[in-house]
Amino acid sequence: MEKRKEKAKESIQAVLPILFIVLLLSFTVAPVSASILLEFMIGAVFVIIGMLFFSMGAEMSMSPMGERVGGSMLKTKKLWVILLLGFFLGVIITISEPDLQVLAAQVPSVPNMVLILSVAAGVGAFLVVALLRILFGIALAPLLVVFYGVIFVIARFVPDNFLAVAFDSGGVTTGPMTVPFIMALGVGISAIRNDKHAENDSFGLVALCSIGPVLAVLLLGLVYPAQGSYVAADVPEAFNSVELGRLFLYEIPYYLKEIAGSLLPIVFFFGIFQLVSIQLHKKTLIKICVGLLYTYVGLVLFLTGANVGFIPAGNYLGTVMASLPCPWILVPVGMVIGYFIVKAEPAVYVLMKQVEELTDGDISGKAMQISLSVGVAASVGLSMLRVLTGIPIMYFLIPGYAIALFLTLFVPKIFTAIAFDSGGVASGPMTATFLLPLAQGACTAVGGDVVKDAFGVVAMVAMTPLITLQVLGLIYKIKSNKKEEMAEQPLLQAEDVFAGYADDAIIEL
């Protein structure tokens, strides 16, 4: 009961600031129709309840499933079996990610199924790389430098229309379905190792899996022509209470089907392991089943609320604010929204909990949340600046990733892994359903190119936490070094006091 209250409090605290900001803007500088405002408020209630169910469900089901599958995979003691299972697992959970369908629709020149399978194969391939890294204790930083180097070299030859969507894909595909399972898989596999670095190596799976989709879409950009254009989504308005209710009720069956299709492959995969290898006790299995039900209900409510309530509000607010005499208000407003919106990402709480547990509280959830919020605030501010000025996204991504990769030389390894994991976690469904429509609405209002200038918000949100969390790691390292120096000082002072005495004189004293 206490845990439910805590989860409910977290969910309310995550969404209320966003609700307050939107209401404040609606009643002051950005007038919004009553219909869209009501849709947003009802959507916020759906999101709060959905977050509550999802956070409880992920803790009860997705995390223990991932850990046990990871441990079970290693029992085969055959590397090729482990890697083959890892690849198929990566493909299955990526295809099951709801946001991947949205991404596919954003690239009109590439057939949907080609893009989905390519991205899924990219995640599968890099999950194999991540598993090899854990099994052989390979450092994460050099891998990141090499793979991001390859990405930016390929990006040089890809049409501009593909760049923003390609980098967005890395954040979109590591969503609420993928993150809890992949992170738990890493914990399960690293637990087999007994060396002191095993705990640190359990992080970094999401970081590497985020690279696969980016590479996949960039490679598709070399093959397919950059044709097609962005088509603005209709903003539905309800003219009475019945129509308002229908907007939500019509979407619920769609997401019931969508999330069922997303969860079933993971449940099927786990079921095979349960029958062949894991064989959990009935009580544990029932708990996991209840957790899966919570996860299912939570994601259905969350995505219904976010898509029906948040997308129209974000799009409309962006359009209105960009049409004001001073459209630059978008930059500070975007930063404030970005600061608070990351708290409403479902997978963020999964990451924070795991970090606190594995570091024995040395890295607190609060410090991590503040670092994430600061990073996302900066990224949304820069994204709004791009919308208003049309600055190419690579002018931000190349220096940003260069700084992030440079910091890996000085930061404790665990902070590097957590930082690059957090990039994929921070850029979840809230970014896709509120921040991206905000940018699209603003871009349309100023007459910009939506494909080049508005898309890329997810990529920016995924990038800045890499820097802010590593800066947190640098501060942590400096403080730890100072503590060690202070602990050694009294001992050194005692040695200085007795330095002039002979051994027998010290004994007499």
At which residue positions do the language-model features occur?
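Intrinsically disordered, low-complexity non-transmembrane regions of multi-pass membrane transporters
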Residues: 1-11, 15, 66-80, 194-205, ...
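Alpha-helical transmembrane segments and their helix-start/interface "positive-inside/aromatic belt" motifs
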Residues: 8-14, 38-44, 72-80, 140-145, ...
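Hydrophobic core segments of alpha-helical transmembrane domains in multi-pass membrane transport
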Residues: 16-29, 43-53, 85-92, 122-133, ...
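Transmembrane helix-loop junctions in multi-pass membrane proteins
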Residues: 24-38, 58-67, 92-107, 126-137, ...
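Transmembrane helix-loop boundary segments of multi-pass membrane transporters
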Residues: 38-39, 57, 104-116, 134-149, ...
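Juxtamembrane and boundary regions of transmembrane helices in multi-pass small-molecule transporters
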Residues: 130-145, 160-161, 193-238, 384-399, ...
